[in-house]
Amino acid sequence: MATSGANGPGSATASASNPRKFSEKIALQKQRQAEETAAFEEVMMDIGSTRLQAQKLRLAYTRSSHYGGSLPNVNQIGCGLAEFQSPLHSPLDSSRSTRHHGLVERVQRDARRMVSPLRRYPRHIDSSPYSPAYLSPPPESGWRRMMPWGNLPAEKGQLFRLPSALNRTSSDSALHTSVMNPNPQDTYPGPTPPSVLPSRRGGGFLDGEMDAKVPAIEENVVDDKHLLKPWDAKKLSSSSSRPRSCEVPGINIFPSPDQPANVPVLPPAMNTGGSLPDLTNLHFPPPLPTPLDPEETVYPSLSGGNSTTNLTHTMTHLGISGGLGLGPSYDVPGLHSPLSHPSLQSSLSNPNLQASLSSPQPQLQGSHSHPSLPASSLAHHALPTTSLGHPSLSAPALSSSSSSSSTSSPVLSAPPYPASTPGASPRHRRVPLSPLSLPAGPADARRSQQQLPKQFSPTMSPTLSSITQGVPLDTSKLPTDQRLPPYPYSPPSLVIPTHPPTPKSLQQLPSQACLVQPSGGQPPGRQPHYGALYPPGSSGHGQQPYHRPINDFSLGNLEQFNMESPSTSLVLDPPAFSEGPGFLGSEGSMSGPQDPHVLNHQNLTHCSRHGSGPNIILTGDSSPGFSKEIAAALAGVPGFEVSASGLELGLGLEDELRMEPLGLEGLTMLSDPCALLPDPAVEDSFRSDRLQ
């Protein structure tokens, strides 16, 4: 026990007297305390940094809702505004929020934050009609707050005298302001009238949507009534005032719906602020020209493929008579155009066309018995009488050009009455526009034969191309299996208006028309009576009244055309010329006053009852000075020459057209729908939709 008692206090004094253990404990204690202090400081540093990061993140979130282009969270922006508000902003924010329909409150920051060089400034604000609060970055309060948005007369004088250096540091459009605006005192003059060329000062851009000089901030504070936003066409009437100092000229929005389409609509400098331009008001011209007839959009352009309906109606719109009944699938190779016949020139110069019809040509009488002869003798005479610059005919002769190759084409053009008749009204002088190719010799005929298959679109046959060229085709040299078969159905009706020579009936009957409807299958045997195919002034029939040819038609005198084979003769359908109400009326009503619209309407309804092909309706109305317009329009087309000498037919025009062989460049211009219609007056005179 003594040893244990002695051992006990001895061990206690030994442990208490050992200073190394105490110092170790103290060192351990201090080390723990230092570690805890370091850990605490680290935690406190983390807390501080997370507070700063949270504040930065919240700032970045409110900014990114504007910069990212996405829709901002309205509630969060409204809540986050409280710490950034200054007393100067508070009376302005209500009017600013109502300006944007209460959807978005713009984030406000005081001027110290705005001097940061890393700040992205707004490029383009309030210039798009897509409610640009969603699409553009927010404007900055450093300059924005200096402008009164409502009627704040107490602050206006105070804010007006703030230094402009503080204002200009806020937006980069202030750079444009300081460069472009030497005079900050003139106020914005309001929307200027539209001017075509963008001017830097008073003219405005293309429709005066902004004045490009971007005036200083102080001038915007002068009067709220001058702060209309003319570049926003939808909000212009609401007279909400906008500043223009933040605007960079970039987007041109055309508020006027009748802005001319040829004004360049591309903005001069594209916007980089995220706002989209309004493309609904921009007038882009359509890639194809508008159809000549708004109702008949089925026949849009001249390159109609292998649809004869397209080509017929387009030629009708262009003032070209469509002698077009040839089916598009017939591709006849080796076609010849026998225009080198010497009687063509004699019939051009001979006013007595009946004599030239009967005297030098045996093909007319016996073309069915002479299959080796050129069977386009009818085209020899229909071409000189109707299509060679005849001013009183609205149907230039493409009509009988396909008579040698197709029995379905209407081969009778209307009887010509030249406008040199005494008292002929100049209102009805129509210079034909047919794309005629009239070669005078065999070399020209061969050249036109080589050119014809290439000149129209590849889907058209050469026969179709030569029909539209007005070149009569000779299929008599082809083998008989390559000739075109007779058509069992009724071919296209053709309404060709001609004009009577007397001025009374010129005024009364401007749109009288003869309806020619050939039909196949009747036996040949009678030579056509050409009492209607001479011009006045020729042998003894010069001044006959106009109803005589119509009477000849209705009596069936022009009953039949002899073609190269007996089974394919063209016959005029006598019911088409009956004197009933289905036609234009009786002989007495021919010379009586009739409404041209009623006549044309009767022509329409009468044509629509005959045949399965297209109707060719050529009205006779023309504006005064029409032939001069056409001559001026055709002056630039190669292959057409305006000659003062005329065609030796005694036409009383000073501007006749002499048709030259049409080259490839002329035909490409011809197939362009805009080439022959350079101006709306000429185009309007071609329209056939004025039938009502």
Swiss-Prot record:
Reported impact of K628R: Translocates to the nucleus and no COP1-mediated degradation
Chain residue numbers at which the record places covalent cross-link Glycyl lysine isopeptide (Lys-Gly) (interchain with G-Cter in SUMO2): K235
Molecular functions per Gene Ontology: cAMP response element binding protein binding
Name listed for the protein in its UniProt record: CREB-regulated transcription coactivator 2
Compositionally biased intervals (Low complexity): 336-384, 391-412
Highest classification ranks of the organism: Eukaryota, Metazoa, Chordata, Craniata, Vertebrata
Consequence recorded when altering S171A: Up-regulates CREB-mediated gluconeogenic gene expression. No degradation of CRTC2. Loss of SIK2-mediated phosphorylation
Principal subcellular localisation of the protein: cytoplasm
Annotated positions of the N-acetylalanine modification: A2
